[in-house]
């Protein structure tokens, strides 16, 4: 069970990182910070 949850977390974090890279090229900063600043 723990392994499955860990895999899910990795997949979610990976997709979030991809979306962040596409939205903000050259910025590896979390999207939440950018959204809150606006």
UniProtKB/Swiss-Prot annotation:
Could you tell me the gene encoding this protein? timP
Which chain regions cross the lipid bilayer?
1-20
Instruction: Name where it's found.
Output: Cell inner membrane
Name it: Toxic protein TimP
Q: What induces it?
A: Expressed under many growth conditions, up-regulated in macrophages.
Membrane-protein topology: Single-pass membrane protein
Keyword list, A-Z:
Cell inner membrane, Cell membrane, Membrane, Toxin-antitoxin system, Transmembrane
Q: What family does the entry list?
A: Belongs to the TimP toxin family.
Traits of the deletion mutant: No changes in biofilm formation, persister cell formation or bacteriophage resistance; no visible phenotype for a double timR-timP deletion. A timR deletion leads to mild envelope stress.
Q: Name one GO cellular component term.
A: plasma membrane
Q: Which organism is it from?
A: Salmonella typhimurium (strain SL1344)
Role of this protein: Toxic component of a probable type I toxin-antitoxin (TA) system. Neutralized by sRNA antitoxin TimR which binds to the 5' UTR of timP mRNA and inhibits translation. When TimP is expressed from its promoter in the absence of antitoxin leads to mild cell stress; overexpression in situ is toxic to the cell and causes membrane leakage. The antitoxin gene is encoded immediately upstream and transcribed divergently from the toxin gene; antitoxin RNA is less stable than timP mRNA.
Chief subcellular location equals membrane
């Amino acid at each position: 069970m723990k392994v499955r949850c860990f895999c899910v977390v990795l997949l979610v974090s990976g997709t979030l990182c991809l979306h962040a890279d596409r939205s903000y090229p050259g910025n590896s900063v979390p999207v939440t910070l950018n959204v809150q600043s606006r």
